[in-house]
């Protein structure tokens, strides 16, 4: 009976310790998967790093320049999709859509659905890169 209690107790403790790690890898607590927001603006910077990269975009909201933060994947994921600091240089006009932040008053998004240049050419749709001309 003592060994059984030990095994059950150990399983409970390990399960409790794993929960935060599992929760971290879900964007749902921070971004609303039931909604999509689309912004159009100019890239100010792209930070490619692990575990998450960030794209910053200046957007005109009622005559005011407001910076949006777009959470992206790892550096390796971006590289596989041909997204580099050269692809999204500061000053590049883009349109991007994704899941909006749940934080009140926040200007952020993640889980990109589309990322396009101002001329409408696709840079990225979801996680599938598009060839030029598509």
Language model: regions and residue ranges:
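Bacterial N-terminal signal peptides that target proteins for export
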Residues: 1-11
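OB-fold/S1-family single-stranded nucleic acid-binding modules
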Residues: 101-127
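Short, structured beta-strand/loop micro-motifs enriched in basic residues and often containing a Trp
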Residues: 72-80
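Short aromatic-glycine-enriched beta-strand elements
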Residues: 49-59
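Short nucleic-acid-contacting surface segments enriched for D/E, G, S/T with interspersed K/R
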Residues: 80-96
């Amino acid at each position: 009976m003592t060994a059984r209690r030990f095994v059950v107790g150990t399983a409970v403790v390990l399960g409790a310790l794993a929960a935060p790690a599992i929760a971290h890898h879900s964007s749902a607590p921070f971004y609303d998967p039931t909604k999509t927001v689309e912004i159009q603006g100019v890239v100010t910077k792209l930070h490619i790093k692990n575990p998450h990269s960030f794209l910053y975009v200046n957007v005109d909201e009622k005559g005011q320049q407001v910076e949006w933060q777009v959470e992206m994947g790892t550096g390796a994921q971006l590289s596989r999709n041909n997204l580099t600091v050269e692809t999204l240089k500061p000053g590049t006009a883009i349109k991007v859509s994704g899941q909006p932040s749940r934080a009140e008053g926040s200007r952020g998004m993640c889980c990109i659905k589309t990322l396009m240049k101002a001329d409408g050419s696709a840079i990225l749709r979801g996680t599938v890169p598009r060839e030029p001309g598509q």
